[in-house]
Amino acid sequence: MSIAHSIRAQIPPIHPEGYPFIGGFAFASLILFWLWAPLGWIGVVLTIWCALFFRDPVRTTPVREGLVIAPADGRVSMVTPVVPPAELGLGDQPLMRISIFMSVFNCHVNRSPVAGRIERIAYRPGKFINAELDKASEDNERNSLVISTPAGRIGVVQIAGLVARRIVSFVREGESLAAGQRFGLIRFGSRLDVFLPEGGKPLVSVGQTAVAGETVLADFQIGDGGRVYRTD
């Protein structure tokens, strides 16, 4: 294997959603170089950051019925029972919610936490307050999915944040998803909430780092001898 090939293998691909932004930063950098070289170098740094933001690395997803996988890179910010948003149609009783906060330095491609069929997609406009705040789940712009699985209906909510102003969805109602499959992204910092049906046992705690498509958030088969899984 050549050195060049080894280097390329370590550089994650860029998601196509990022091309216009990276191109814009690069063009602005050229103009800044023309105006004053130090400003141009600042533009180069911002262009590199933008490319890193839209990186889309390959992930190895644990596969077994009953596992719930992290839908986003970031930090687990909340693990607590709350009443899910009304648009999910999951009832008015508290369900276990696991929240992952994504900073502007995290990869922002979102992946399905489970394998199943998309039963519902609901978009709701809203504000852009700090996504780390609990009230962001009620006040902020969000896009919600309900995924039907053998373990029950899983709610996944993309929440825009203080900097994030655009939620992008790649899927439609009725489509089937594989665990770890890409289903959307949020531009420039945000939060993902996962609502578990009864019986899901969280395996993460607040402050833990989550890796989209790899970290196991919860398991519906704890106590059933079903902890063995494979990776695809």
Curated annotation (Swiss-Prot):
Keywords: Cell membrane, Decarboxylase, Lipid biosynthesis, Lipid metabolism, Lyase, Membrane, Phospholipid biosynthesis, Phospholipid metabolism, Pyruvate, Zymogen. The record marks G189, S190 as: Cleavage (non-hydrolytic). Pathway: Phospholipid metabolism; phosphatidylethanolamine biosynthesis; phosphatidylethanolamine from CDP-diacylglycerol: step 2/2. It is found in: Cell membrane. It is a peripheral membrane protein. It holds the Pfam family PS_Dcarbxylase. GO terms for cellular component: plasma membrane. Its EC number is 4.1.1.65. The modification Pyruvic acid (Ser) is found at S190. Is synthesized initially as an inactive proenzyme. Formation of the active enzyme involves a self-maturation process in which the active site pyruvoyl group is generated from an internal serine residue via an autocatalytic post-translational modification. Two non-identical subunits are generated from the proenzyme in this reaction, and the pyruvate is formed at the N-terminus of the alpha chain, which is derived from the carboxyl end of the proenzyme. Binds 1 pyruvoyl group covalently per subunit. GO terms for molecular function: phosphatidylserine decarboxylase activity. GO terms for biological process: phosphatidylethanolamine biosynthetic process. Its cofactor is pyruvate. The active site is at S190 (schiff-base intermediate with substrate). It catalyses: a 1,2-diacyl-sn-glycero-3-phospho-L-serine + H(+) = a 1,2-diacyl-sn-glycero-3-phosphoethanolamine + CO2. HAMAP family: PS_decarb_PSD_A. Heterodimer of a large membrane-associated beta subunit and a small pyruvoyl-containing alpha subunit. Belongs to the phosphatidylserine decarboxylase family. PSD-A subfamily. Catalyzes the formation of phosphatidylethanolamine (PtdEtn) from phosphatidylserine (PtdSer). This is Phosphatidylserine decarboxylase proenzyme. It comes from Afipia carboxidovorans (strain ATCC 49405 / DSM 1227 / KCTC 32145 / OM5) (Oligotropha carboxidovorans).
